[in-house]
Curated annotation (Swiss-Prot):
One of its GO terms (cellular component) is plasma membrane. Receptor for EDA isoform A2, but not for EDA isoform A1. Mediates the activation of the NF-kappa-B and JNK pathways. Activation seems to be mediated by binding to TRAF3 and TRAF6. Associates with TRAF1, TRAF3 and TRAF6. This is Tumor necrosis factor receptor superfamily member 27. Residues 160-297 are cytoplasmic. The keyword Nucleotidyltransferase does not apply. TNFR-Cys repeats lie at residues 2-41, 43-83, 85-118. Glycans are attached at N74, N77.
Length: 297
């Protein structure tokens, strides 16, 4: 003979009713259909409860947050959790018989106007939308402000760079113009004769000097400038002309001051020989041929 769902078979083969456990307790193992004769009562595990006597198992407590409702009482081993009203922006549907669902659903635009809780929440949302600016608009305004600041900074740096280059260019142009004007002024004050543009180096040779008396200096061309500096005063040979191809003995008219300057420029070391080759007197002019050594330039 088979045992019922609440019976177990004892050692003599008879069907015996399973042990009953009180509230907050359950059997340690399933009992029924001839099995579970050694089961005993234990306390319900956490998050489970049992409110009546019986051999059945403890039931799982309800979670109010899962069904979008406010929890009013916690779950115990003898009682289930108690849930209250729906959370904000949620409502419970009403069935045809007047009963309401246990679970609350979100409010939408299609929610009937009879649901007072959804009507109140939608009005609050509209007021918030008018008072609080959207996050996207704030982000766009911030990005736009940063772009404007970066653009102004870039334009300022570019302007300073261009101004620096322009000032440098103007300074270079003024310097070149000043150098050119200075060169033109020097050329106008000290013109270079065509035959004296280059001055090659000369070896030690014999020079020819021509000395004039002081009474004829007034009519001389070398002293006709009345103290103004001439090109001859800047030459190392002191009135001696420079030859293009070779040293040529040519009479040159010089003053006593030129002779003194030339004599002081000759080095004192070494023997100096003065030999009078020819002395010619032609009127008031005396020509002397004097051998001398010219220092290399």
């Amino acid at each position: 003979m088979d045992c019922q769902e609440n019976e177990y078979r004892d050692q003599w083969g008879r069907c015996v009713t399973c042990q009953q456990c009180g509230p907050g307790q359950e059997l340690s193992k399933d009992c029924g259909y001839g099995e579970g004769g050694d089961a005993h009562c234990i306390v319900c595990p956490p998050r489970k409860y049992k409110s009546t006597w019986g051999h059945h198992r403890c039931q799982t407590c309800i979670t109010c947050a899962v069904i979008n409702r406010v929890q009013k009482a916690n779950c115990t081993n003898t009682s289930n959790a108690i849930c209250g009203d729906c959370l904000p922006r949620f409502y419970r549907k009403t069935r045809i018989g007047g009963l309401q669902d246990q679970e609350c659903i979100p409010c939408t635009k299609q929610t009937p106007s009879s649901e007072v809780q959804c009507t109140f929440q939608l009005s609050l949302v509209k007021v918030d939308a008018h008072t609080v600016p959207p996050r996207e608009a704030t982000l766009v305004a911030l990005v736009g402000s940063l772009l404007v600041v970066f653009a102004l900074a870039f334009l300022g740096l570019f302007f300073l760079y261009c101004k620096q280059i322009f000032n440098r260019h103007c300074q270079c142009r003024d310097s070149l113009q000043y150098e050119a004007e200075k060169t033109v002024e020097e050329d106008s004050l000290f013109p270079v004769p065509p035959g004296q543009e280059t001055s090659p180096e000369f070896p030690a040779n014999e020079g020819i000097l021509e000395i004039k008396p002081l009474n004829s200096i007034l009519d001389d061309d070398c002293s006709s400038t009345r103290g103004f500096p001439t090109q001859e005063s800047f030459t190392m040979a002191s009135c001696a002309s420079e030859s293009h191809s070779q040293w040529v003995h040519t009479p040159i008219e010089c003053t006593e001051l030129d002779l003194q300057k030339f004599s002081s420029s000759i080095p004192s070391t070494g023997p100096e020989t003065l030999r009078e080759n020819t002395a010619e007197h032609s009127g008031d002019r005396l020509e002397l041929y004097v051998p001398f050594e010219v220092p290399s330039l």
